[in-house]
Regions:
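Metal-ion/cofactor- or nucleotide/acyl-coenzyme-handling active-site neighborhoods
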Residues: 1-168
Length: 168
């Protein structure tokens, strides 16, 4: 089994002994340094494994790592990213987001969106972070094309419009 771990996780020694003695698990460390700039420069950095498009969520580095593997096609399933209808703003200007996940859809509730300083985030900040994530998919699509590879989104109703769509 191959186990991909971001380099920053190496600081936490707690999980490492669990894997160290298992000969069936191969550990791959990847760099999540956000890379921006001219596409050709970014492609060179991505190929070297020195960084990824701004990794706003786990899917972005996952696709980047997949493109470094010997597969010609990568299929995305369960990547709906349909966050926009989940956002509301209260009459007190508090931004709420109902983040549903497959493992807690019946229990999740709308909650205040917090910034790193734990203050309530403004709507423009939330939308900007979404912009960054969606833009990263277009950067990955261009990189995939340059490699002669293809990322295919098989998620019905997905908001990710950067990749070719296909129904299963």
């Amino acid at each position: 089994m191959n186990f991909f771990v971001p380099a920053r996780a190496l600081k936490d020694k707690e999980w490492q002994p669990l894997l160290a003695g298992n000969p069936h698990i191969k550990l791959y460390i990847y760099n999540t340094t956000p890379i921006e700039g001219f596409q050709s420069f970014c492609n060179w950095i991505f190929r070297k494994g020195w960084g990824v498009p701004r990794p706003h969520n786990v899917l972005i580095p996952s696709i980047a790592m997949g493109l470094r593997l010997p597969f010609r096609k990568i299929y995305l399933a369960g990547a709906d990213h349909s966050w926009l209808p989940e956002i509301t703003v209260t009459d007190d200007n508090v931004v709420l987001m109902h983040q549903k996940h497959f493992y807690d859809q019946n229990k999740s509730q709308a909650d205040t969106v917090k910034q790193e300083n734990l203050n309530s985030a403004r709507l423009y900040t939330v939308l900007y972070h979404m912009y960054v994530a969606f833009k990263s998919y277009f950067i990955l699509e261009a990189y995939a094309r340059k490699l002669g590879k293809e990322v295919i989104n098989v998620t019905p109703g997905s908001y990710i419009d950067a990749f070719k769509r296909m129904k299963l």
